[in-house]
């Protein structure tokens, strides 16, 4: 059985395909600069980060192409749905990501958006390299074997 999720960490958006398409080597928690209507919309749980990625713009990191829908109860002061959002990282983390993306061919992918125990919106970023087709097939084969093995053990025991 899967372990229980941390009740203080409420996941709003999950990039489930990221671990299939990328080989994630390192993960980092980052804050995200949001407007008020974005936070209210996130609490509704309708965000999508399937096509999102993080990248540098100047000397800061931004989250690009993340979809946070408009807050329905807001009036004319609503936000843009796919605007770049600034990520709150330490300088050492930014330099690490910059070095990995520019020299080594890595990509920074958002894995989850969640609210921590203090109610702050956070993004879990993964530093990953794209998998080749044969690696994806191997991952799918391993996952199927684990599922079959668990089914056999359950039926036998």
Swiss-Prot record:
Keywords: Cytoplasm, RNA-binding. GO terms for molecular function: RNA binding. Its main location: cytoplasm. Residues 133-157 are annotated as: Disordered. One of its GO terms (cellular component) is cytosol. SUPFAM superfamilies: Small protein B (SmpB) (SSF74982). PROSITE patterns: SSRP. Gene3D superfamilies: 2.40.280.10. InterPro entries: SmpB (IPR023620), SsrA-bd_prot (IPR000037), SsrA-bd_prot_CS (IPR020081). Belongs to the SmpB family. Required for rescue of stalled ribosomes mediated by trans-translation. Binds to transfer-messenger RNA (tmRNA), required for stable association of tmRNA with ribosomes. tmRNA and SmpB together mimic tRNA shape, replacing the anticodon stem-loop with SmpB. tmRNA is encoded by the ssrA gene; the 2 termini fold to resemble tRNA(Ala) and it encodes a 'tag peptide', a short internal open reading frame. During trans-translation Ala-aminoacylated tmRNA acts like a tRNA, entering the A-site of stalled ribosomes, displacing the stalled mRNA. This is SsrA-binding protein. It comes from Methylobacterium sp. (strain 4-46). The gene is smpB.
